[in-house]
Amino acid sequence: MTTPEYGSLRSDDDHWDIVSNVGYTALLVAGWRALHTTGPKPLVQDEYAKHFITASADPYLEGLLANPRTSEDGTAFPRLYGVQTRFFDDFFNCADEAGIRQAVIVAAGLDCRAYRLDWQPGTTVFEIDVPKVLEFKARVLSERGAVPKAHRVAVPADLRTDWPTPLTAAGFDPQRPSAWSVEGLLPYLTGDAQYALFARIDELCAPGSRVALGALGSRLDHEQLAALETAHPGVNMSGDVNFSALTYDDKTDPVEWLVEHGWAVDPVRSTLELQVGYGLTPPDVDVKIDSFMRSQYITAVRA
């Protein structure tokens, strides 16, 4: 296993809640979604995201929501995560319209698609994540009286363990087509863990199943991000989070793996290409961010 140059905050048996370690990244992304929702020309609406920030009482994120930035630099990460959210929203909407009635959100974090999207009747949305994250989300949404638009099933499990067993025990049927999202997760897994994740998903997918994978940063470089934040001061919206210390630099190529295992892979797109597809012109700061973070958004169908 290769660890980041700047030292890792990770260990093989580390654990987290919503305000620590990898769990905090889910809270941070929820903050960016909340900012995008209320910002200029939002691509998605996530009215629940702000409630997670309030419930967390995180002073940094509460400060961002209280005084949102409006410049192109200041809205960069909310904009880019809005693009990412729209990509996965569109993926599930297309799968749902095609008749797939099982959706699996891997490392669901504070994702609220079970509540936001207009699912067809009979659809079940399975959310896999560690217990403390799922418990926090359920508590906040319950306090807000949120009602899912599909049959939502929480699956408390660590992806480094035998998560397929609790998933199938929760009602997932591997004999029926399913749609899977792996959003923003891969940089936080070792190459071996990525390979194991792909293999387990593959084993659970009937013909016609679909998968979407993607992250804004398939490669995270601490020095380049710091240099960008110096040149574009408004970009620094991650507080003191050092993503390089939470991620791994050994990878399994997802496209290569999927093709070798019989999946039909659509053309890979970057966040910049997605923006153009959504009718936007990527600002210079977005181009610079993607030049070193190297976003990848992938969809594929099981033959």
From Swiss-Prot:
EC number: 2.1.1.-
Job of this protein: Exhibits S-adenosyl-L-methionine-dependent methyltransferase activity.
GO molecular function, a single term: methyltransferase activity
Species assigned in the record: Mycobacterium tuberculosis (strain ATCC 25177 / H37Ra)
Pfam families recorded: LCM (PF04072)
UniProt record similarity statement: Belongs to the UPF0677 family.
Binding positions for S-adenosyl-L-methionine per the UniProt entry: D129, D158, L159
Keyword Ion transport: no
Name of the protein this chain belongs to: Putative S-adenosyl-L-methionine-dependent methyltransferase MRA_1908
Transmembrane parts of this sequence: none
Top enzyme class: transferase
Signal sequence bounds: none
Domain of life: Bacteria
InterPro entries given in the database record: Ppm1/Ppm2/Tcmp (IPR007213), SAM-dependent_MTases_sf (IPR029063), SAM_mthyl_Trfase_ML2640-like (IPR011610)
Alphabetical UniProt keywords: Methyltransferase, S-adenosyl-L-methionine, Transferase
Gene3D superfamilies: Vaccinia Virus protein VP39
The UniProt record lists the keyword Transferase: yes
